[in-house]
A protein has these predicted regions:
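Solvent-exposed, non-transmembrane regions of membrane-associated and secreted proteins
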Residues: 17-234
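N-terminal Sec-pathway targeting helices
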Residues: 1-13
Length: 234
């Protein structure tokens, strides 16, 4: 009887191992496919000349007309196209080529102006466990990291926008973030609020802020946590 139970236990262990190995392979395959997809998109559409980067938006648009921009933060691995879907679910699990993908695509909130002229331009991306997509946003909450990587570049079909990070923190997911402010006072109050919430201490000059750029990804410190990185034009 003991021998039979031993063999049953052994078979169960083997089955659990095989299922776990299969799942791990599935995760690895999914991560690799997504990484390869975006590396190819970058290779085909980002050109570097004398240190300057240019994005071929005509070529990108021919592949996917939902393209609205490209986000790049030197030294972080953040270097991706930005799309805007019909809602905020469309690109959660669909890559730039409109194929199913756990990594999804970096996307602009569907309520924002696609030309990035909203008062608060909100950009979402997954926090992938292999460090891709917006995973590195969490590093902006570290003061030592932020000192070296405080600039985020946003390329659009019409211009290049240089951004400076003014706040970075993690809190429970906010169901609604303001996209439009009723007046300048409301906008200033919001800026004061997000700066108080910032984990690293960031100096900010007194010049007028026209608009905010908010980058959002999942955090895993607590259930339903998000990391928010806010930036303004330099």
């Amino acid at each position: 009887m003991k021998k039979i139970l031993y063999h049953i236990f052994l078979l169960l262990c083997i089955a659990v191992f095989c299922i776990s190995a299969y799942k791990l392979y599935g995760y690895y395959k999914s991560y690799k496919e997504a990484k390869d997809t975006y590396e190819k998109i970058k290779k085909d559409n980002v050109k570097k000349t004398n240190g300057d980067r240019t994005i071929d938006f005509d070529k990108l648009r021919a592949k996917n007309p939902d393209i609205v921009g490209w986000v790049y933060a030197k030294g972080t691995g953040i270097d991706y196209p930005i799309v805007q879907g019909k809602d905020n679910k469309e690109y959660l699990h669909m890559d730039y080529n409109k194929k199913k993908s756990s990594s999804g695509t970096i996307f602009l909130d569907h309520g924002c102006d696609k030309s990035f002229i909203s008062d608060n331009n909100i950009i979402y991306g997954h926090h992938m466990k292999n460090g891709t997509m917006f995973a590195k946003l969490l590093k902006f909450r570290e003061e030592s990291f932020l000192k070296k990587h405080h600039v985020i570049i946003l390329y659009t079909p019409k211009k290049t926008i240089y951004l400076k990070v003014i706040s970075a923190y993690a809190v429970k997911a906010q169901d609604q973030m303001p996209i439009t402010f009723a007046n300048e006072t409301q906008k200033k109050e919001y800026i004061t609020k997000i700066r108080r919430m910032s984990e690293p201490s960031i100096k900010l000059d007194d010049k007028k802020i026209d608009r905010i750029y908010t980058f959002v990804t999942c955090s895993y410190e607590r259930d339903d946590n998000r990391t928010y990185v806010h930036a303004v034009e330099e």
